[in-house]
Amino acid sequence: MQQQYNPSAIEPKVQQFWAENKVFKAVKDVTKEKYYCLSMLPYPSGKLHMGHVRNYTIGDVVSRYQRMIGKNVLQPMGWDAFGLPAEGAAVKNNTAPAKWTYENIEYMKGQLKMLGFSYDWDREVTTCRQEYYKWEQWFFTELYKKGLVYKKTSTVNWCPNDATVLANEQVHEGCCWRCDTPVEQREIPQWFIKITDYAEELLTHLDNLPQWPDQVKTMQRNWIGRSEGVEITFKIAGSNAELPVYTTRPDTFFGVSYVAIAAAHPLAEMAAENNPALAEFIREAKNTKVAEAELATMEKKGMATGLFAIHPLTGKEVPVWVANFVLMHYGTGAVMAVPAHDERDFEFAQKYGLQINQVIQPLDGSEWDFSKAAYTEHGKLINSAEFDDLNFEQAFNAIADKLESMKVGKRQVNFRLRDWGVSRQRYWGAPIPMMTTEDGEVVTVPMQDLPVILPEDVVMNGVQSPIKADPEWAKTTYNGKPALKETDTFDTFMESSWYYARYTCPQYHEGMLDSDEANYWLPVDQYIGGIEHATMHLLYFRFFHKLLRDAGILNSDEPATKLLCQGMVLADAFYYTSPTNERIWVSPTQVTLERDEKGRIIKATDPEGRELVHSGMTKMSKSKNNGIDPQEMVEKYGADTVRLFMMFASPAEMTLEWQESGVEGAKRFLGRVWNLVYEYSQNPATAALDVAALSKAQKELRRDVHKTIAKVSDDIGRRQTFNTAIAAIMELMNKLTKAPLENEQDKAVMAEALSAVVRMLYPITPHICFELWQALGNNDTIDFAPWVVADESAMVEDEKLVVVQVNGKVRVKLPFRQQQPKMKSKQLRKRMQT
């Protein structure tokens, strides 16, 4: 053992041992309890960032701990390799997306290995490889045959100059990212998967996930958005047209003063045929893409169509308006507006001078000022014919009954969730395995012709997908007759929705999954990833698992039992203002700081001496140039130090503030551990531990060791409070460095303590512990060592201090042995007097 701790000498050697001996290879073993630990796979963007490092370090700590407690652990890694950034990078770097992607994978794989993560690399999955997406294509054709896939027209962003579809990310302030042309909204045919068929199950099964964060489950419940209401049919005056609307508040039905429809609604387009002003308004509204989250705050705009809808119960006519706050793809694309009892309807009615009819009164009978706001709470019905004086629940049922009896309405459960649009008009994705024959029939690509291979050796011009630009690529045959292949590709969420299952059998070629292997390893025992994925990836992930179950491939209901959402990594951000009033962000690694006595930054300068503005701790990002390169940190401090800081600086679910001073502190701590083991190894114990012969001080030290073992075991295993586990080990180390090594029992207690410390640190800092384990005289490697178990008897204190109070005042403090025989009152009095 070297006297000085030198991670650059230790870590590559240990990593080579792991690789050559395939130490972390996972093999199905029905005699052992399995444990599948999975971190969300990365997009191969070129370099790891600190968010990756935090995620994967948490996963590795969990995996190594679970191996030590005797479980058969699977921890794989792969690449979510399709996606839009590769197309932009290909154009910028004059290369093909495939080449750029594969080079990035190799580089990032080296970075992961440098950090010492215990992956089974034999199970590596790369989603842009045809052996992976072949089975995704096959499964899509099976879903189509089951009626779970369909094609319909849907709205996309269209650049008229480039004549191409743009992803939302390619639209900057309403214009094309490439040519700055105003973007239009266009209707084109797209493929959808019926996730709505599973909406109820996706909602109710959230109750079966007690180890998922409540915040994620709440976000999914809101996204699925189950509501109970009534669909009501209005007739259009002077025509045979009908207008269905859905409402969760039938109790307000008598307060309807207008009906609002989406710009894309067929009635709107019909009304605009002879109304140029309305046609222009509709065109403008269609081309203004509005996120649902913005609907509440955006300016409400509308225009009367000239049409009137007939109220089914009163027979009165109410005007039909086109409104920009109604979206065609939500509900029926039309809403009954009750301005007196809905804030959005109220705002619109006030702007355009529409009627406000009160039909709900507060339950306490108080008056409401409708000149200021709508009354949106439940209450008692007024101005509602025979339904007056009913409360919400009574009115809901009574009005629904009446509408159903008249056959102009029906009770209905609605979901906010929409079917999953999986078509992308991009190149770098898996081709959708559908064809259109020369007579217009849409058919699936037969199994024997799968995969539909995406050509990788292409030239990107930044305008159109190479497979759309090449008419020859689409040409094929079906039953000996000419046909055309679909040129859209899959949404990349498709690949990331089932990769976790493919890890269980990545070399299986007889089908999508080997059910025996998949059902042994699944569900995932611990999934780790950011909460930003709550309503997209994590929902599709659950949906796909249910599809695989219903296809008879899997036998579980949910893909992951436990979910941990790690917090973001923050770093200081600094900038100066250029002569053109532009903020120029300077990397924290280039900044010289002055701090006050409390450690607060009081001055920051860049290498040119410019004084910088400190904008605080913000999420690491390219835009603020405050990302810290993990590779630089590993080269400077060592992988174990970076891992230790990541696990110690903050609870796993909370944001982590990157402080290089904290990294330096982590390095110093590991140096202290190394030094103590080195000191012990120069004069190790030669006698076995004799508990009966221990002195009081030796027993106290041993008690501290085993109390720490118990705490760390609980913190890492059950509570997953890794930072408090590390704090406990640090506290123990403070005591161990002060402990004497004067006799054989001192050394024996120290030997036991150091063996425990090294094993407790191993999941977090595996390289240094690999070396220290051998320095302590162990012949096997620590990778196969069992977790240290606390000795209950060692934690029992010999004496307890008993405080005796009389009339609330402390009279005496008496030390009592744990096995103290019962005392008579006379003996107790005597002790109190001495």
Curated annotation (Swiss-Prot):
Its main location: cytoplasm. The keyword Cytoplasm applies. A motif ('KMSKS' region) lies at residues 619-623. ATP binds at K622. One of its GO terms (cellular component) is cytosol. It is an enzyme of class 6 (ligase). PROSITE patterns: AA_TRNA_LIGASE_I (PS00178). The keyword Cytoplasm applies. GO terms for biological process: leucyl-tRNA aminoacylation. Gene3D superfamilies: 2.20.28.290, HUPs (3.40.50.620), Isoleucyl-tRNA Synthetase, Domain 1 (1.10.730.10). Keywords: Aminoacyl-tRNA synthetase, ATP-binding, Cytoplasm, Ligase, Nucleotide-binding, Protein biosynthesis. One of its GO terms (molecular function) is leucine-tRNA ligase activity. It catalyses: tRNA(Leu) + L-leucine + ATP = L-leucyl-tRNA(Leu) + AMP + diphosphate. SUPFAM superfamilies: Anticodon-binding domain of a subclass of class I aminoacyl-tRNA synthetases, Nucleotidylyl transferase, ValRS/IleRS/LeuRS editing domain. It is found in: Cytoplasm. Its EC number is 6.1.1.4. A motif ('HIGH' region) lies at residues 42-52. Pfam families: Anticodon_1 (PF08264), tRNA-synt_1 (PF00133), tRNA-synt_1_2 (PF13603), tRNA-synt_1g (PF09334). Belongs to the class-I aminoacyl-tRNA synthetase family. This is Leucine--tRNA ligase. It comes from Actinobacillus pleuropneumoniae serotype 7 (strain AP76). The gene is leuS.
